[in-house]
C-alpha cells in the first residue's frame, strides 16, 4: 500500500497524519514536539519506519490573501529538512482554514464521546489529516518551492 504523511508544522508541536491514496483518507497519528525549530527526529524516524510513506505533504501557512507569512518560513525550513533527511518527495500545500476544520472535527468527536478534553493536543494531528486529505483528493494545490529529492 502506498501511503503519504501529512504535517501541520507549528512552533511547539508538529501534527502528523498518515493517508491512504486509494481511499483518499487520512488520520492523525501523532503530535511531535518541536523545540526551537528542532523536531523530535527520533519520534519522526520511528513513525517513518513503521509506516514507510512515499510522499511527505507539509502545510504552508498563508494569509487569507494567499501571501506567505512569518510562520511560512518555519514550514519551508521543515519541508527542506524532511527532504534532506528522508530523500522523499516533499510537497508544500496551502493550509488555510485547516485548523478551523480540525477544531470542528475534534468538537464533533468530543460530543460523540470519542475524544476527551485532555486529548486537545491531537488537534494538531487532526489538522495534519485535513491538510493531507486536501492533497489526496486534489482539493489543494502544491505551492511553488516544494522540495524534491
Where are these regions (language model features)?
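Phosphate- and other anionic-substrate recognition elements at nucleic-acid/protein interfaces
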Residues: 2-7, 11-149
